[in-house]
A protein has these predicted regions:
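A cross-family phosphate/adenosyl-ligand binding-site feature
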Residues: 1-124, 129-166
Length: 166
C-alpha cells in the first residue's frame, strides 16, 4: 500500500508491554511512505519500566519518523483547526485512555489530539490494549464503537482460560 503524502498522527499511551510492536508498526507506516507524527501521552513520556526507559523509546520513535513528536496539550490542540492529519491512530490505547476518550476528557496530548482530529470528521483508529481490564472497559469501548469516524483494530481477550474475568 502506498501511503505517500499521508499524514498520520500516531498516539501512544502507556501499554508498555506493547511498545516493541508499536515501534514495528510505526516503522512499517514510514516504509510505506507515510509522514508519521508521534503523539506521546504523559505516561509514555515519563515512565521507565521493565520494557525500557521512556527516553529511549521516544528517541527510537522520533528517529524512525524523523519527527520530534507532540508532547503537550498546547502542541496537540492545533490539530483540529489546522486539519493536517489524514488519519489518527491510537496504538496502544489503554483502557484508561479509552474511558477518558468516551467521556470527552482531554487531559493528555493523545486525547487532546484525538478530540481535535475528530472535529474534522476524519478517521480515528484505536488499537485497544487493556490487558486484564478488557471486560471492565467494554462499556467505554462500546460507546466509542458507536461513535462516527472511530474504528477499532480487531481485538480479543489475551488469555481467556487463565483470566476468565479479564
Amino acid at each position: 500500500m502506498d501511503l505517500s503524502n499521508r499524514n498520520i498522527g500516531y498516539g501512544i499511551t502507556g501499554s508498555f508491554c506493547t511498545f516493541a510492536k508499536t515501534r514495528k508498526e510505526i516503522q512499517r507506516l514510514t516504509e510505506m511512505g507515510a509522514h508519521v507524527i508521534p503523539i506521546f501521552s504523559y505516561q509514555t513520556q515519563n515512565c521507565d519500566t521493565r520494557f525500557g526507559t521512556a527516553k529511549e523509546f521516544m528517541e527510537e520513535v522520533c528517529d524512525i519518523t524523523g519527527n520530534p513528536g507532540i508532547r503537550t496539550l498546547q502542541e496537540a490542540e492545533p490539530i483540529g483547526p489546522k486539519g493536517y492529519l489524514d488519519v489518527m491512530v491510537i496504538a496502544p490505547c489503554t483502557g484508561n485512555s479509552a474511558a477518558k476518550l468516551a467521556n470527552a476528557i482531554t487531559d493528555t496530548p493523545v486525547l487532546m489530539a484525538a478530540k481535535a482530529h475528530m472535529r474534522n470528521g476524519k478517521p480515528l483508529v484505536i488499537a485497544i490494549s487493556t490487558n486484564d481490564a478488557l471486560g471492565a472497559s467494554f462499556k467505554n469501548i462500546g460507546m466509542l464503537m458507536n461513535t462516527k469516524h472511530i474504528y477499532f483494530v480487531p481485538f480479543a481477550q489475551d488469555n481467556y482460560e487463565k483470566k476468565p474475568n479479564s
